[in-house]
């Protein structure tokens, strides 16, 4: 069964192309809005019991998510508000379960000025994405594949842009095994309309993920390796520049190992199946890019907790970006299935 999964991985890799988020339009699509996801580092791909997870890996859509709804909100950096709502529902047919999601970003109000700097009023900017997805189990295997389609709308003052994107995911899951493996290709698509007539790339991304739950230890580990479509994702940190006595500035030199580590995100969840659990994660790239010279900022670290009360689950995440900025994310999940006595366990 694992061989089938690896063949799928190779196929996805062959059709991928280079694109790193941050150099493209609609970059908000690669920002986590889920409190549980955020606490684990921001890009976990293997959460099988979370109705928000299909936003990152549509292969995790499964029947146990039926009639679960979740809402998340974060007062992000610089007064930016981000949030999302997810819902899953079972139907009859080959594609039994469908998942829907709305993600939005409100950048707030800005001062509008003419070319001479004279203020002429204010304007707003926002992004929104609507997604619908489903999954399918490959017969006689433990491999599940999924896809979702996203309609994207972005506006800045009187200008706007729309786009259409697809996510593809695959996951190897066996209820008798303590591990899972995932492969995801996200944001494959194009702009339907542009801001100024110039077409821009979407934030295409390829990532693999894994999770492992030791037999006698209630601590599930998560690993994500992102941006596989491009090896060099390093950006010199201005804080690490050096200046000699003549005033010549030398940028930070990023080693092979340093760049490799920036692809990694790790997370851990203590008591993952209990009513109360604790989470922690570390994003190596964020930690390196927001590092301050000779100052311990703890950038890249995130942590949080989950609290389940009957059919309601509260999630909280605290993300450390910089010594001058931190982000709190709140999540609320409700199980609307009257025939289920508890939140679905971690299985299909």
Q: Where in this protein do the model-derived segments appear?
A:
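Sec-dependent N-terminal signal peptides
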Residues: 4-14
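Positively charged n-region of N-terminal signal peptides that target proteins for export
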Residues: 1-4, 140-141
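Subset of outer-membrane beta-barrel
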Residues: 19-348
């Amino acid at each position: 069964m694992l061989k089938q999964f690896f063949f799928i991985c190779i196929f996805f890799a062959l059709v991928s192309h280079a694109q790193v988020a941050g150099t493209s339009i609609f970059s908000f699509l690669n920002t986590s809005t889920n409190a549980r996801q955020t606490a684990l580092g921001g890009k976990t791909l293997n959460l099988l019991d979370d109705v928000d997870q299909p936003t990152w890996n549509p292969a995790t859509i499964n029947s146990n998510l039926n009639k679960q709804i979740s809402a998340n909100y974060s007062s992000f950096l610089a007064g930016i508000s981000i949030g999302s709502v997810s819902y899953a529902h079972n139907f009859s047919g080959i594609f039994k379960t469908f998942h829907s999601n709305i993600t939005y970003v409100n950048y707030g109000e800005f001062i509008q000025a003419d070319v001479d700097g004279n203020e002429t009023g204010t304007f707003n900017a926002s992004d929104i994405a609507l997604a619908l997805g489903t999954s399918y189990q490959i017969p006689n295997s433990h491999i599940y594949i999924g896809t979702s389609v996203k309609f994207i709308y972005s506006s800045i003052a009187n200008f706007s842009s729309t786009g259409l994107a697809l996510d593809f995911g695959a996951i190897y899951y066996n209820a008798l095994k303590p591990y899972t493996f995932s492969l995801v290709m996200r944001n494959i698509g194009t702009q339907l309309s542009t801001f100024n007539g110039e077409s821009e790339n979407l934030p295409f991304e390829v990532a693999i993920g894994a999770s492992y739950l030791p037999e006698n230890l209630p601590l599930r580990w998560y690993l994500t390796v992102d941006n596989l479509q491009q090896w060099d994702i390093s950006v010199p940190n201005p804080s690490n520049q050096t200046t000699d006595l003549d005033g010549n500035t030398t940028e930070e030199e990023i080693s092979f190992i340093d760049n490799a580590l920036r692809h990694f995100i790790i997370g851990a969840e203590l008591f993952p199946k209990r009513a109360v659990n604790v989470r922690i994660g570390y994003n190596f790239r964020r930690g390196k890019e927001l590092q301050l010279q000779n100052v311990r900022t703890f950038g890249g670290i995130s942590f949080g907790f989950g609290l389940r009360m009957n059919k309601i689950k509260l999630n909280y995440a605290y993300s450390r970006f910089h010594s001058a900025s931190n982000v709190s994310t709140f999540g609320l999940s409700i199980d609307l299935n009257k025939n289920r006595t508890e939140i679905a366990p971690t299985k299909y």
